[in-house]
């Protein structure tokens, strides 16, 4: 009986371990992107897009790369190749679980993607973080840094022609801090 319990415990430990770490990476990616949005030394530019300025895709690609998900290392460079590479790096397509009109179902860390035009990341409470446009309403030629407070910013979810929503494994939640694996001893 003891050997069987140990075998079952090991099975479930191994099974659940494949999802461990997802929430920490989600939090790291979200927090990094929000930090960039809150720092006016970073603005929008499609020419100088890997820091200190970013465009919509480079902001999210760099956020996930910094969080330990190797999307940039695996070739993600723009909205047109994000879907395939993000899926290969542990994301799943959860578009069918989302009401794209209202944003209902979008979770913290979800990538909202229009493959041709734009991407943003859900940060919870009906909010997204995104890089939008430079101070002239364009994509290139602005000054370094955020001149308007809305070049890279957080805003409410909005209805956009999103093609898909990608979620990192074990996405959206925060791991409870006081959960321990214990051995059950019958009384």
Predicted segments with their positions:
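Catalytic Cys-His active-site segments of thiol-dependent hydrolases/isopeptidases
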Residues: 73, 121-154
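Surface-exposed intrinsically disordered loops and tails
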Residues: 85-100, 139-157
């Amino acid at each position: 009986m003891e050997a069987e319990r140990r075998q079952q415990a090991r099975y479930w430990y191994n099974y659940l371990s494949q999802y461990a770490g997802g929430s920490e990476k989600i939090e790291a990616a979200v927090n990094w992107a929000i930090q960039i949005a809150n720092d006016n030394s970073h603005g929008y530019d499609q020419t100088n897009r890997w820091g200190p300025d970013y465009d919509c895709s480079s902001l999210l690609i760099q956020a996930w790369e910094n969080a330990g998900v190797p999307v940039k290392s695996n070739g993600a460079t723009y909205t047109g190749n994000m879907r395939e590479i993000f899926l290969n790096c542990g994301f799943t397509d959860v578009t069918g679980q989302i009401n794209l009109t209202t944003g209902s179902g979008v979770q913290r860390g979800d990538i909202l993607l229009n493959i041709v035009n734009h991407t943003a990341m859900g940060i919870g409470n009906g909010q997204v973080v995104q890089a939008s446009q430079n101070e002239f309403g364009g994509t290139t030629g602005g000054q370094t840094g955020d001149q308007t407070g809305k070049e890279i910013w957080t805003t409410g979810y909005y209805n956009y022609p999103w093609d898909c929503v990608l979620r990192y494994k074990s996405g959206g939640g925060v791991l409870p801090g006081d959960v321990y694996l214990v051995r059950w001893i019958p009384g």
